Amino acid sequence: MAAIIIRGSDIAQEIREDLKKEAAWLKAYGVVPGLVTILVGQDPASMSYVTAKQKTACKLGFYSLQDSQPGHVSESLLLDRIARYNKDPRIHGILVQLPLPPHIDEQKILYAIDPGKDVDGFHPYNVGKLMIGQADFLPCTPAGIQQLLIRSGIQTDGAEVVVVGRSNIVGKPIANMLLQKQKGANATVTVCHTGTRDVGVHTRRADILIVAAGKPKAITADMVKEGAVVIDVGVNRVGVTSDGKAKLCGDVDFEPVREKAGAITPVPGGVGPMTITMLMVNTLKAARLSAGL
């Protein structure tokens, strides 16, 4: 029997409807959530992501600003822009679209953002709070994954969770989040990475398998336990469709795994819409905290 499809696009829409109401409530107090997205260069994927974020913010009634800089922009100028937005009362969330050009120290840029406006959750202050289960802003993709699990009624308490990938953006934070003794967590978590000798040994015992490997179809059906929940974080461009659009696939070999899993997220339409939605959740929360509401 084929797996249940967990459609992140549907769950994201539910959350966005709630956000619209909360934004209207804040507006009654004279507060409009404000988000600035800083884009360096003209990478097509980054430009597409930034456009999607801006459109979503506008639909929710947020104040949205895009600060586009050329690829040769200096690190010092970028730091000056961030310092300006740190002080701007209209801006509650600052997002720097990654990756940055090689001549810019990514860490230095992210660390310059006011932790109270760090809606990506990458500042060391917010990472530290995440580690002890007290984060104000959860990293957007891991937060989206957790909400997918909670809102799909998937039991994490006591579950064997295997995360494939140890990036600072997805793998490490989702592992830490699911370890916490909290709702939507309290799992036994294993993290696989490039140093793992036999990934399949671990993935085959996972009740919940979260894949963020950055490699197309890295997880095949023989690596998945019967009835497992599979969350595919990967987005890989593997060609072009007949109408000229990018052809995408995840890190999971979807069709064969779908026949074995109990539930699975598609690519696109799975984790992606949740990432943008959780960015909006964080921006609204930052606005509320800033106003003391």
Swiss-Prot record:
GO biological process terms on file: L-histidine biosynthetic process; methionine biosynthetic process; purine nucleotide biosynthetic process; tetrahydrofolate interconversion
Oxidoreductase found in the keyword field: yes
Single GO MF descriptor: methylenetetrahydrofolate dehydrogenase (NADP+) activity
Binding site for NADP(+): G165, R166, S167, T194, V235
A single GO cellular-component term on record: cytosol
Oligomer status and interactors: Homodimer.
Protein name as annotated: Bifunctional protein FolD
Native source species: Syntrophus aciditrophicus (strain SB)
Chain's gene name: folD
